[in-house]
Amino acid sequence: MKYAHTCIRVKDLEASISFYEKALGYKVTREKDHSADGFKLVYLALEGDKTELELTYNIGHGAYNIGDGYGHVAVESDDLEGDHARMKAEGFDVTELMGLPGEAPRYFFVTDPDGYKTEVIRRGI
């Protein structure tokens, strides 16, 4: 078996695509328009990675309740401090740089328009 994708449901497809492209560098890899059946699917991936993030847009559905079971998705960064500063300057909802107790900062979180968190971690940790 091989990991294929993670699906999240979004209330505003264009806002979500823009967030994942601008904040994290994802690119749209494919789209499936099932508007006649009430939904659209957009798949995104990071450069050089075949694992996809699937954005599911159910037409006419409002915001989703993420609940307390969802944690986060994680991506690696070659320039953690630079990516953090850029996202903060561009107005994305980011935490401060963090580390585990007794360790130097090595990650932060950024939140998408629907409230889903992505952990950005220093590559090689």
Go through each PLM region and give its residues.
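Hydrophobic side chains in well-ordered alpha-helices
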Residues: 16-19, 83-87
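Helix N-cap motif at beta-to-alpha junctions
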Residues: 12-13, 77-81
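N-terminal beta-strand motif that seeds the catalytic metal site of vicinal oxygen chelate
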Residues: 1-17, 70-73, 121-125
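Exposed loop/turn and edge beta-strand positions of beta-sandwich/beta-sheet ligand-binding modules
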Residues: 38, 69, 104
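Vicinal oxygen chelate
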Residues: 29-33, 75, 84-125
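Short, charged/polar surface micro-motifs in flexible loops or helix N-caps
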Residues: 47-51, 60-62, 80-82
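Core segments of cupin and vicinal oxygen chelate
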Residues: 7-50
